[in-house]
Amino acid sequence: MNYEQPPAYTGPGPAPGYPAQGYPAQGYPTQGYPAQGYPPQGYPAQGYPAQGYPNYPPGPPGPYTAQPGYQGYPQPGPPTNTVYVVEQGRRDDQSGEQACLATCWAALCCCCLCDMLT
């Protein structure tokens, strides 16, 4: 395959020089076509206030208060952040045995992992 001159595309579609059926030919639009340019954008001017909304009374001036909760449910109190601190007690009678056992298990696991990886 020559990358400087690739083969012609033979996919589906019209033959070169003929427009696809159902599409107008490219070039100047036919007579009667709408004038060129962009259509007007945005909404038409409605005045103030917008005429589509009823005249509600104005809200209170100044900073607004927080919206109250739904009146059908009781209002919850402030959040309770109860934290229970539990400290595990140490047993002095077997601390040496526990440390030795934990060390042996760690060494055994490391040896098994090294054997599996090699």
Swiss-Prot record:
Keyword Isomerase attached: no
Keywords attached to this entry: Membrane, Transmembrane, Transmembrane helix
InterPro entries: CYSTM1-like
GO cellular component assignments: membrane
Biased composition (Low complexity): 1-54, 64-74
Localisation: Membrane
Region (Disordered): 1-82
Top-level taxon: Eukaryota
This protein's name: Cysteine-rich and transmembrane domain-containing protein 1
Organism lineage string: Eukaryota, Metazoa, Chordata, Craniata, Vertebrata
Gene field: cystm1
